[in-house]
Amino acid sequence: MKSITFLFVSLFIWSVSIAQKDTTEVFKAVNALRYALVEKDSGVLKKLLHTDIAFGHSNGWVQTKNDVLKDMKSGYLIYQKIDSQSTAITISKNYATVKERIAVEGSRDGNAFKLNLFVLQLWVKSKSGWQLLSRQSTKL
């Protein structure tokens, strides 16, 4: 009986440890995404953005992976600052839901913007790590 109890306790502790590791990895990926958008790091973005991403903005505009990279390179969409005010992460198997409140400053087609947003992101765990599959923001 003691060995069965020990086994269950060990499995529980192991599963909590795995969940904490995944949460930490997703948190790092979310921070890396913000950094890559501001610093225009296409190498990091190529790794973090899933091939099938739908990158939705608060004005209804939705970008593909190629759109994000092209608009960043051309200077059409520039992020000068992305500050996280709160982040909540929920892990479910190979998926993570991230809810964030952010303050964003930048410009689109030469027009400056300053927004407070609520952002919902869906991340998927792939062989290469966590990748952003879907993102939608709304103005606060």
Q: Which residues does each PLM region occupy?
A:
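Positively charged n-region of N-terminal signal peptides that target proteins for export
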Residues: M1-T5
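Bacterial N-terminal signal peptides
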Residues: F6-W14
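Short, low-complexity N-terminal intrinsically disordered segments enriched in polar/charged residues
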Residues: W14-T51
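Hydrophobic pocket/interface hotspot
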Residues: L33, L45, I53, V68, ...
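A short gly/proline-enriched turn/hairpin at secondary-structure junctions
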Residues: D52-Q63, K73-I78
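Surface-exposed, charged secondary-structure patches
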Residues: M72-N111
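Short beta-strand edge/turn micro-motifs at domain boundaries
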Residues: N116-L140
